[in-house]
Swiss-Prot record:
PANTHER family: DNA-DIRECTED RNA POLYMERASE SUBUNIT OMEGA. Promotes RNA polymerase assembly. Latches the N- and C-terminal regions of the beta' subunit thereby facilitating its interaction with the beta and alpha subunits. InterPro entries: DNA-dir_RNA_pol_omega (IPR003716), Pol_omega/Rpo6/RPB6 (IPR006110), RPB6/omega-like_sf (IPR036161). The RNAP catalytic core consists of 2 alpha, 1 beta, 1 beta' and 1 omega subunit. When a sigma factor is associated with the core the holoenzyme is formed, which can initiate transcription. Belongs to the RNA polymerase subunit omega family. The lineage of its organism: Bacteria, Bacillati, Bacillota, Bacilli, Lactobacillales. The gene is rpoZ. This is DNA-directed RNA polymerase subunit omega. It comes from the Bacteria.
Amino acid sequence: MMLKPSIDTLLDKVPSKYSLVILEAKRAHELEAGAKPTQEFTSVKSTLRALEEIESGNVVIHPDPEAKREAVRRRAEEAKRLAEEEERKIKAQIAKEKEEGEKI
């Protein structure tokens, strides 16, 4: 029985068998948790779906882990900044409404 996608095809997409297993497992868990698929699948199982995505090149190992960490950190900082800005706007609106209420 021939497995599809073939291991040879998949190993062209990742540096090693070990990387392939880790990437497949992580993507399969993401799919099980409800992550949006990147394509239509022929397989039913999440592990085989993950392999199909890897074969098509839609799922890859991030080439620079440090750059990925930096991008995640920047996104977190931006989200925090936006939340603080929103909180300041709400406090200013509350103060304005309170001030207008005292004038009446």
